[in-house]
């Protein structure tokens, strides 16, 4: 089941969630719907394409407390609420990687959900963020367009997709 924004090509089960202009509230609203409908799920953003079964929790090489010091505004408030839940020694899981989720007590206000989930699960693997290090292909998933800045990289992405998936899947229109 897909919750949130639906790509044009997808024709499987879907629950639409109205978008919010505030990105943190938008993600929070989608998580609420997921928690109301599922006990466990794979949390990821719309620019990820899975290549294999996936259950690993990745955390950043940048500490969560360091991230808070380098940010401001609404994001800083969300990060501080997260720190209040997980504690000052929390590992930072806010990366552009999919993450396996199990239902947990979701606070009323937006938080950094992957950091809360990651600090609950344990057994993480430390990595650099693929988006900020322009890593296109991971052995388990493919990072989409936000990693790219030029047309030639977009073409490279399309070529990789065509090699990986020469035939349309049952979920494509």
Regions found by a protein language model. Give the residues of each.
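Structural alpha-beta junctions
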Residues: 1, 12-15, 121-128
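Active-site-proximal specificity loops/subdomain of glycosyltransferases
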Residues: 3-39
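Short, solvent-exposed loop/turn segments at secondary-structure junctions
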Residues: 6-9, 21, 48-50, 55-56, ...
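Extended catalytic core of nucleotide-activated donor transferases of GT-like folds
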Residues: 22-34, 157-172
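Short beta-strand-to-loop acidic/aromatic patch adjacent to the donor-nucleotide binding site
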Residues: 39-51
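Conserved donor-nucleotide/metal-binding helix-loop-beta segment in metal-dependent transferases, i.e.
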Residues: 50-81
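Catalytic core and acceptor-binding pocket of nucleotide-sugar-dependent glycosyltransferases
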Residues: 70-156, 165
